[in-house]
Regions:
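Electrostatic, structured charged patches in enzyme active sites and in nucleic-acid/phosphate-binding
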Residues: 1-146
Length: 146
């Protein structure tokens, strides 16, 4: 049994979805983002795992392919169309200060290489790259000091 929430996402607005008709979420965070993209009126189109970006794996030195979680086309508050590539990751795999274990640190090294390649790819294609962590996806109240 998987430790994380996984399953198939069925969009309520399938006309917004680009590409493959079967969309799989690999975490509850991805599911939350999918629901947002599917339902938000500013999102024009979105795709899940639709692009491959070449990069060199810093742990093995071998060429590899990075498949970001989402590609999104939306209209900003000024009416301009924007395109973004979006990755959903836990903060322990995205932020140096949160990577405590050896595994988290290795994931961070690998992710940093993937994200550098993604930023370069996005710049060449007139897009932006965004990493979403749990603090971006969920609004939580600050803990009270005792």
């Amino acid at each position: 049994m998987s430790k994380y929430s996984q399953g198939r996402f069925v969009p309520k607005n399938p006309a917004k979805l680009i590409g493959k008709q079967e969309v799989v979420f690999r975490s509850s965070w991805e599911l939350t983002v999918m629901n947002f993209l599917d339902n938000h009126p500013s999102v024009i189109q979105w795709a899940s795992e639709s692009i491959r970006i070449p990069y060199t794996n810093p742990l093995t030195g071998r060429p590899s392919q990075y498949v970001p979680d989402f590609m999104v086309l939306y209209q900003d508050k000024n009416g301009n169309r924007r395109a973004e590539v979006v990755e959903v990751k836990p903060s322990k795999e995205a932020l140096v200060e949160n990577a405590k274990s050896k595994r988290d640190k290795a994931s961070l090294i690998l992710n940093t290489a993937k994200w550098a390649a993604a930023m370069s790819w996005c710049k060449k294609n007139g897009m932006t790259f965004r990493i979403l962590t749990e603090s971006d996806i969920y609004i939580t109240k600050p803990k009270k000091k005792r």
